[in-house]
Amino acid sequence: MESKVLLLLALSVWLQSLTVSRGGLVAADRITRGKDFRDIESKFALRTPEDTAEDTCHLIPGVTESVANCHFNHSSKTFVVIHGWTVTGMYESWVPKLVAALYKREPDSNVIVVDWLSRAQQHYPVSAGYTKLVGQDVAKFMNWMADEFNYPLGNVHLLGYSLGAHAAGIAGSLTNKKVNRITGLDPAGPNFEYAEAPSRLSPDDADFVDVLHTFTRGSPGRSIGIQKPVGHVDIYPNGGTFQPGCNIGEALRVIAERGLGDVDQLVKCSHERSVHLFIDSLLNEENPSKAYRCNSKEAFEKGLCLSCRKNRCNNMGYEINKVRAKRSSKMYLKTRSQMPYKVFHYQVKIHFSGTESNTYTNQAFEISLYGTVAESENIPFTLPEVSTNKTYSFLLYTEVDIGELLMLKLKWISDSYFSWSNWWSSPGFDIGKIRVKAGETQKKVIFCSREKMSYLQKGKSPVIFVKCHDKSLNRKSG
């Protein structure tokens, strides 16, 4: 008799554990139309514009009342934010910032934050493996919303950071219909660089997949962010390696000022920059940063890729043009070290002339640009080689919009060490014209010396060039 009582008591406790979960809601209600949602561990918080930092209301798959209780807007688009690996087991500070920026740009939208913190706090390889289960959770949730409420998945935009980008990709591959867009914010590299498409973010996971790569420094498979292109458009700001303001010198300065408590922030500075670049695109919609298609970052650094013909340039971030090429498009741009991140790109071409054949390596120069709106002075650049009667192309950028170019100054910087030959006779070149192309406006300008030729000497005064007045030159420059 006593054993039967104990058995009934144990059975009662077991049934109670099945039927009570998540704020007292009954788990049995999560069996809807023959589908069991009780295996979903991820939580889906619909945050509000008034409280972007707290998960105050959860949408629970299988519990239809939760959708009404959270005031889900069925007629608006939905953003689903998926965080990455975490050391602390808490949301990182960028999450409420992204939520706030999304609501500021799309006030009537739904912004859902996926909580998989318990799985994301494990050792990295374990958390990386969990992205498959998290992706399955998100897919089940989205399919339920589509089936139960006829909510169109074409209104869904998934945004995943680091490991969350791959979870977003897996989710997109498992939904009954494709979601509209997935944005990968520096998708994680380790365990995914050589993974097959079904196990990571890929172009097939949504109608359009765009990716920002901001921390790809290191050998493939060991860099924090994935190196290879995994979307329809893959953008590599500042080459995709280190980001401005995230260098070692900055790290030492911050440690000296704030102590070692911020070391983890510095380690992920470039990684997390992907999120802040996207936030910038939401808040500064009238001035989107422009990226340019290029075969390599080396060619981009030479200024050879500032063309916008045939979709060769695109906006970075929220206002990207959804161009779906057969092959993934790798694009590059420069940015500032802080918001707003937009800069203005220029290709500069200089022909160095002379009667004597000379070659100099690793030469430092400064150029100053003057326009109708502002000027940008003493912009440093280095040419790996300068030889007589050769033309060199390189990339410059300014942090301010200087308007239409009117004039420029060019200076050849003297060596930091003393040289008897330079003291006795400074080397120099004749320069007749300098060609400049503005990436943002696509305008080309040819600058001429005030004389027929200007003699540029190392360590001497800068040489001034003004816009050429020859109409035929202007026609050729486009």
From Swiss-Prot:
SUPFAM superfamilies: alpha/beta-Hydrolases, Lipase/lipooxygenase domain (PLAT/LH2 domain). Residues 35-56, 446-470 are annotated as: Interaction with GPIHBP1. One of its GO terms (cellular component) is chylomicron. GO terms for molecular function: apolipoprotein binding; calcium ion binding; heparan sulfate proteoglycan binding; heparin binding; lipoprotein lipase activity; lipoprotein particle binding; phospholipase A1 activity; protein homodimerization activity. Keywords: Calcium, Cell membrane, Chylomicron, Disulfide bond, Extracellular matrix, Glycoprotein, Heparin-binding, Hydrolase, Lipid degradation, Lipid metabolism, Membrane, Metal-binding, Nitration, Secreted, Signal, VLDL. It comes from the Eukaryota. Disulfide bonds join 57-70, 246-269, 294-313, 305-308, 448-468. Residues 344-467 form the PLAT domain. The modification 3'-nitrotyrosine is found at residues 124, 194, 346. Tyrosine nitration after lipopolysaccharide (LPS) challenge down-regulates the lipase activity. Its main location: membrane. One of its GO terms (biological process) is cellular response to nutrient. SMART domains: LH2. The apolipoprotein APOC2 acts as a coactivator of LPL activity. Ca(2+) binding promotes protein stability and formation of the active homodimer. Interaction with GPIHBP1 protects LPL against inactivation by ANGPTL4. Ca(2+) binds at residues 197, 200, 202, 205. Residues 420-424 are annotated as: Important for interaction with lipoprotein particles. It catalyses: a triacylglycerol + H2O = a diacylglycerol + a fatty acid + H(+); a 1,2-diacyl-sn-glycero-3-phosphocholine + H2O = a 2-acyl-sn-glycero-3-phosphocholine + a fatty acid + H(+); 1,2,3-tri-(9Z-octadecenoyl)-glycerol + H2O = di-(9Z)-octadecenoylglycerol + (9Z)-octadecenoate + H(+); 1,2-di-(9Z-octadecenoyl)-sn-glycero-3-phosphocholine + H2O = (9Z-octadecenoyl)-sn-glycero-3-phosphocholine + (9Z)-octadecenoate + H(+). It is an enzyme of class 3 (hydrolase). The active site is at 162 (nucleophile), 186 (charge relay system), 271 (charge relay system). It is a peripheral membrane protein. It is found in: Cell membrane; Secreted; Secreted, Extracellular space, Extracellular matrix. Residues 1-27 form the signal peptide. Belongs to the AB hydrolase superfamily. Lipase family. Key enzyme in triglyceride metabolism. Catalyzes the hydrolysis of triglycerides from circulating chylomicrons and very low density lipoproteins (VLDL), and thereby plays an important role in lipid clearance from the blood stream, lipid utilization and storage. Although it has both phospholipase and triglyceride lipase activities it is primarily a triglyceride lipase with low but detectable phospholipase activity. Mediates margination of triglyceride-rich lipoprotein particles in capillaries. Homodimer. Interacts with GPIHBP1 with 1:1 stoichiometry. Interacts with APOC2; the interaction activates LPL activity in the presence of lipids. Interaction with heparan sulfate proteoglycans is required to protect LPL against loss of activity. Associates with lipoprotein particles in blood plasma. Interacts with LMF1 and SEL1L; interaction with SEL1L is required to prevent aggregation of newly synthesized LPL in the endoplasmic reticulum (ER), and for normal export of LPL from the ER to the extracellular space. This is Lipoprotein lipase. It comes from Ovis aries (Sheep).
